Each structure stands twice: as structure tokens, then as C-alpha cells.
From Swiss-Prot:
The lineage of its organism: Eukaryota, Metazoa, Chordata, Craniata, Vertebrata. This is Probable G-protein coupled receptor 176. The chain crosses the membrane at residues 42-64, 78-98, 109-129, 158-177, 205-225, 265-285, 302-322. CDD domains: 7tmA_GPR176. Keywords: Biological rhythms, Cell membrane, G-protein coupled receptor, Glycoprotein, Membrane, Receptor, Transducer, Transmembrane, Transmembrane helix. GO terms for biological process: adenylate cyclase-inhibiting G protein-coupled receptor signaling pathway; circadian behavior; G protein-coupled receptor signaling pathway. Residues 65-77, 130-157, 226-264, 323-513 are cytoplasmic. It is found in: Cell membrane. The gene is Gpr176. Orphan receptor involved in normal circadian rhythm behavior. Acts through the G-protein subclass G(z)-alpha and has an agonist-independent basal activity to repress cAMP production. GO terms for molecular function: G protein-coupled receptor activity.
Length: 513
């Protein structure tokens, strides 16, 4: 029985082992699918961030180069070209790759042959323009350092160079219409699901990557090395000695300012980020084209989709952060916009109703009147005697107002008696007329019984009653602003100078006849 039991046990345990192996395989496959799905979601999120940041950053670069004159016109043209190509690549490449990364079979119309070829052509063009803009900027930097007092690249030559960049990109991208399964740096989706390898496709991939990617990047590093060598101390010494030996020839001494050094660092950082982010793309091209491996890893494919697009975001970020002059201009412009916006908020426009809770500067619509009012209060502070006299006068006027109110009949409507102006406004000719009758108890300050306030009212120190006050600030030239303005300052007699025969200056005072 034990033998039978031992014999049955392996027979019964074998199906259990096979079912366990199948369950383990299913669980591992499910784990891989879940990891791939999580990585796909991460890829989609990163591409959305790159899309928004690239558009905002490149538009900011365009705005800063158009608004400020930090760099020369030739350098600005190349930077604008790089920013425009980044915007176009972000608009054309990123959205469709986001859709394909989310769900590869969601949009069937993307896989139509005509639409796919046109889309891949635009991908190639904008990617090529972005890469070819790097050596153009490096060439401009090389000439500006080696010949700081000369202009080797004129505006016409820079326009021709930009036209060549776009023509090169278009010519290098035209074969996409003949080859369907072509992947580029910023978009790795293909027009056919089955990868077909051919000799023509291999030749095109090699020629394109050598002429449009590898050679331009090598030229950038070559120019940067030449710039570094020209700025070295030994090379400068040789140039100075040669200039001293041949003074009749004009020899330029290499020079790089702080601004140009920052631009060199920006260019080097851009190219370095581009190379590092393009490593997954290069690996994918080698796998599919050279090694002819059709079934590549999903993780490699997704990494080759999102990682090269980081350079679209890194280019404007590096340009706006590394260059101190650009950063200062950008911050200054933002501060000016903030001041202008806050000033517009302070000055209320469009509504005629004024809230009583607002400050006087907001009620008036301008801060000048409030500043004038504060200045008057600080300069013309009443003395103790003046405060006592004003208090007595206010008490007498309150008593008179009460008598008028008690003497009026009860059946009639009570009308507000015209307030007697204080002594401070008796001689004023330019007093502001009241808009509405004001009760004396609303304004408890020294101007309580004045019906209006304006910048042309006379302070108490200008009036005849307070002429002998110690706090007078003006001489007694008149009582009103008109009299003060009409007073004439005595003319100072001019002194005549005459030259004698001995070249001596004689000064004769002019006598009024």
C-alpha cells in the first residue's frame, strides 16, 4: 500500500507541477504587462510635461530675443531659428506620440499611408533643423571670439545659412515618402507594423544619420575646441607677439566676454543633453537596421520615444537660465509688467460708483492729490493757540446751528442751513465748490466745515489773520495765489565787461538812468 501510494504520488503530483508552472508563467506575464502599462503611463505623463514646457520655453526665448538686444543680430537669428524648430517639433511630433504611447491602436487614421508619410516627413524636417542649428551657432561663436572687432558673418550671410539649414532638412527628409518604416529622433513610430529591412532603407538611414546628426554634432565640438584653444594664454601670447612684429598688418586678438562665455556653456550643454538623450534612439536604430532584430523590448521602444524629446525642453531652459544677461532682461521685463498691472489695479476705471471703504488714493483715481494732502498736513501743523481758537470757533458754530434748527417750524421739512465758512477760507478765491451738502460731524479734522477740498485751497499760514504766526513759510507777498503769482521779482542789474587796449578786463556797473 505504501508502494502504491508512493507510485501514485508522483503521477498525481506531475499535473500539479505543470499547472503550477503554467500559473507561474501567467503571473510573470501579467507582472510584465502591468510593468509595461505603468511605464507606458509614465511615458505619457513625461511627454505631456515636455510638450507644455517646450512650447512655453521656446515662446519665451522668441519673446526675449525679439524684445531685448542682448546678442548680436546674427546670433539672435540663429537662436530664433532654433526656437522655431523646437516649437514646430513639439507641435508635430509630441502629440501623436502621446496618443500612440497611451494606446497603440486607438487612432486608426494615423496608420493611413498618406497621413503617416506626411507626418514622418514633417518629423524629419523639424528634427533636422534643430540639429543643424547647433553648428550654425557654434560657427558664429567661433568668428565672434577669434575676430571680435570684425563682422565675418553679415546679416545676408546669416539669412543664407538659415535657408541652407531648411533646404538641407527638406532634402534629407524627402526619401521618407519612398521608405515607409522610417524612425526619427523625436518620433519613433513607423508607418507599418511589420518592420521590413532592405538595402535602400539601410543606405538611407546611414546617410541621414551621418550627414544630419553625426557630422553637425562633431562640427560643434570642433568649433568649441578651437575656441578654447584660441582663448588659452599661450595662444594669446603668440598672437600678441605676431602683432608686435608686423605692426602694419591688422591682427585680431581673441577675446570672449562673460556673455559670450555663458553662450558657449549654453551651446555645450544643449549638445551634451541632445547626445545623452539620443542614446536609446541610436540603440533602437542599430537593433532594427543593422542587427535586423524586429522584436525589440517594449521598454526600449518607450524610452526611445520619450527620452530624446527631453532636449526640446532642455534647450530653452538652458538658454534662459545659464545666460545672466537674458535672465536679467527677462526678470526686469516681468517686474515692469507686474508694476504696470498693479498700477492698473490701483487706478479704478470704468465704474462711477466709489466705495467708501477704499483709501483716498483709490477714490481719487490718482495718488498725487493724496500726496499733496499728506504734505499739507505734515508741513502746516497748527500750533496750540491756533487749535484753541479753532475749537472755540467750532463750538460757536455748533451753537448757532442748534438755534437755527430749534427755531424752524415742525410741519415744514428741515433744510440744511448753509454753513459759515471758517476763517481759513474767507479770503480764498479758488475754493472748490461743494458737490453735496456735508454735515459738520462727518469730518472731525481741521477742514471739517469746508464744503470741498482741492489742491488750490489756501492753508491758514497764507491768510491775513495768521500773518504774524511763527510757522509762516512764505513772506507776506499777498493773500491769494493770484497775488503771489503776480508779484514781480526785482531784476538784478547786469554788469558790463569791457576790454581795454592792454587786454585787461574792466568791470563797469550799469547805472540806471
Amino acid at each position: 500500500m505504501g508502494h502504491n501510494g508512493s507510485w501514485v504520488s508522483p503521477n498525481t503530483s506531475h499535473p500539479r507541477n505543470t499547472s503550477g508552472a503554467q500559473a507561474g508563467a501567467n503571473s510573470s506575464a501579467f507582472g510584465e504587462l502591468s510593468e509595461a502599462q505603468l511605464y507606458r503611463q509614465f511615458t505619457t505623463t513625461v511627454q505631456v510635461v515636455i510638450f507644455i514646457g517646450s512650447l512655453l520655453g521656446n515662446f519665451t526665448v522668441l519673446w526675449s530675443t525679439c524684445r531685448t538686444t542682448v546678442f548680436k543680430s546674427v546670433t539672435n537669428r540663429f537662436i530664433k531659428n532654433l526656437a522655431c524648430s523646437g516649437i514646430c517639433a513639439s507641435v508635430v511630433c509630441v502629440p501623436f506620440d502621446i496618443i500612440l504611447s497611451t494606446s497603440p491602436h486607438c487612432c486608426w487614421w494615423i496608420y493611413t499611408m498618406l497621413f503617416c508619410k506626411v507626418l514622418k516627413f514633417l518629423h524629419k524636417v523639424f528634427c533636422s533643423v534643430t540639429v543643424l542649428s547647433f553648428p550654425a551657432i557654434a560657427l558664429d561663436r567661433y568668428y565672434s571670439v577669434l575676430y571680435p572687432l570684425e563682422r565675418k558673418i553679415s546679416d545676408a550671410k546669416s539669412r543664407e545659412l538659415v535657408m541652407y539649414i531648411w533646404a538641407h532638412a527638406v532634402v534629407a527628409s524627402v526619401p521618407v515618402f519612398a521608405v515607409t518604416n522610417v524612425a526619427d529622433i523625436y518620433a519613433t513610430s513607423t508607418c507599418t507594423e511589420v518592420w521590413s529591412n532592405s538595402l535602400g532603407h539601410l543606405v538611407y538611414v546611414l546617410i541621414y544619420n551621418v550627414t544630419t546628426v553625426i557630422v553637425p554634432v562633431a562640427v560643434v565640438f570642433l568649433f568649441l575646441i578651437l575656441i578654447r584653444r584660441a582663448l588659452s594664454a599661450s595662444q594669446k601670447k603668440k598672437v600678441i607677439i605676431a602683432a608686435l612684429r608686423t605692426p602694419q598688418n591688422t591682427i585680431s586678438i581673441p577675446y570672449a566676454s562673460q556673455r559670450e562665455a555663458e553662450l558657449h556653456a549654453t551651446l555645450l550643454s544643449m549638445v551634451t543633453v541632445f547626445i545623452l538623450c539620443s542614446v536609446p534612439y541610436a540603440t533602437l536604430v542599430v537593433y532594427q537596421t543593422v542587427l535586423n532584430v524586429p522584436n525589440t523590448s517594449v521598454f526600449l521602444l518607450l524610452t526611445a520615444i520619450w527620452l530624446p524629446k527631453v532636449s526640446l525642453l532642455a534647450n530653452p531652459v538652458l538658454f534662459l537660465t545659464v545666460n545672466r544677461s537674458v535672465r536679467k532682461c527677462l526678470v526686469g521685463t516681468l517686474v515692469q509688467l507686474h508694476h504696470r498691472y498693479s498700477r492698473r489695479n490701483v487706478v479704478s476705471t470704468g465704474s462711477g460708483v466709489v466705495e467708501p471703504s477704499l483709501e483716498p488714493s483709490m477714490r481719487s483715481g490718482s495718488q498725487l492729490l493724496e500726496m499733496f494732502h499728506i504734505g499739507q498736513q505734515q508741513i502746516f501743523k497748527p500750533s496750540e493757540d491756533e487749535e484753541e481758537s479753532e475749537a472755540k470757533y467750532l463750538g460757536s458754530t455748533d451753537f448757532q446751528a442748534k438755534e437755527v434748527l430749534t427755531s424752524s417750524p415742525e410741519g415744514e421739512e428741515s433744510q440744511l442751513a448753509p454753513s459759515v465758512p471758517p476763517p481759513g477760507t474767507v479770503d480764498s478765491v479758488s475754493r472748490v465748490s461743494p458737490v453735496a451738502p456735508v454735515e459738520p460731524g462727518i469730518f472731525p479734522d481741521k477742514y471739517s466745515l469746508q464744503f470741498g477740498f482741492g489742491p488750490f485751497e489756501l492753508p491758514p499760514q497764507w491768510l491775513s489773520e495768521t500773518r504774524n504766526s511763527k510757522k509762516r513759510l512764505l513772506p507776506p507777498l499777498g493773500n491769494t495765489p493770484e497775488e503771489l503769482i503776480q508779484t514781480k521779482v526785482p531784476r538784478v542789474s547786469r554788469v558790463e565787461r569791457k576790454m581795454s587796449r592792454n587786454n585787461k578786463v574792466s568791470i563797469f556797473p550799469k547805472v540806471d538812468s
